[in-house]
Amino acid sequence: MAAAPGARLLRAACASVPFRGLDRCRLLVCGTGAGTAISPWTPSPRLHAEAGPGRPLSVSARARSSSEDKITVHFKNRDGETLTTKGKIGDSLLDVVIENNLDIDGFGACEGTLACSTCHLIFEDHIYEKLDAITDEENDMLDLAFGLTDRSRLGCQVCLTKAMDNMTVRVPEAVADVRQSVDMSKNS
């Protein structure tokens, strides 16, 4: 089976970064559809690797964005305020929050490594039913989240599609960071 574009580069990049344990090198594959295994050998329109906190590695050149490549996303924060921004098709909702510097305290504390549930979001019914299937790892983290609903997902695991244009996602009033057992309530 042929390797995905950039897979060889990904393996080399992860191997060349000094850190303890290869388990800290993760691969986020967006836009591949439900049931896709996350692996450097999976063909994907977008590959992004990370080697530990604060060590992003680009393994493929991102296409230049045009206004057609972006959609509008509305985040309803803990105070009920709606934050409206644009996000690139294929980016995760965590990427959107970070790249647009949205004021959502504590959101994505683990930087998308599935080690916390601080990017917990609640989706509208018509959007939730179109999302890719949830993985066991994401489900395990969601079990630890405050305010869990039947429409809850982690923002680091949901990638934008055109069908999500103008969606509204709600940030729960309280968040649990399982790494520190910290409650960041509405006051944050």
Curated annotation (Swiss-Prot):
Q: Which Pfam families match?
A: Fer2
Q: Which cofactor does it need?
A: [2Fe-2S] cluster
Subcellular location per UniProt equals: Mitochondrion matrix
The N6-acetyllysine modification is found at K70
The transit peptide region is found at 1-64
| Keywords assigned by UniProt, alphabetized | 2Fe-2S, Acetylation, Cholesterol metabolism, Electron transport, Iron, Iron-sulfur, Lipid metabolism, Metal-binding, Mitochondrion, Phosphoprotein, Steroid metabolism, Steroidogenesis, Sterol metabolism, Transit peptide, Transport
* GO cellular component term of the entry, any: mitochondrial matrix
Q: Which CDD domains match?
A: fer2 (cd00207)
Q: Where does [2Fe-2S] cluster bind?
A: C110, C116, C119, C156
User: What detail does the entry give on cofactor binding?
Assistant: Binds 1 [2Fe-2S] cluster.
Which positions fall inside the 2Fe-2S ferredoxin-type domain?
Answer: 69-175
Q: Per its record, what are the GO molecular function terms?
A: 2 iron, 2 sulfur cluster binding; electron transfer activity; metal ion binding
Q: Which positions does the record annotate as the modified residue N6-succinyllysine? A: K70, K162
Q: Which residues carry this modification: Phosphoserine?
A: S67, S181
Q: What does this protein do?
A: Essential for the synthesis of various steroid hormones, participates in the reduction of mitochondrial cytochrome P450 for steroidogenesis. Transfers electrons from adrenodoxin reductase to CYP11A1, a cytochrome P450 that catalyzes cholesterol side-chain cleavage. Does not form a ternary complex with adrenodoxin reductase and CYP11A1 but shuttles between the two enzymes to transfer electrons.
Oligomeric state and interaction partners are given as: Interacts with CYP11A1.
What the record says about family reads: Belongs to the adrenodoxin/putidaredoxin family.
* PANTHER family cross-referenced by the UniProt entry: ADRENODOXIN, MITOCHONDRIAL, FERREDOXIN/ADRENODOXIN
Query: Which protein are we looking at?
Result: Adrenodoxin, mitochondrial
Organism, as annotated: Mus musculus (Mouse)
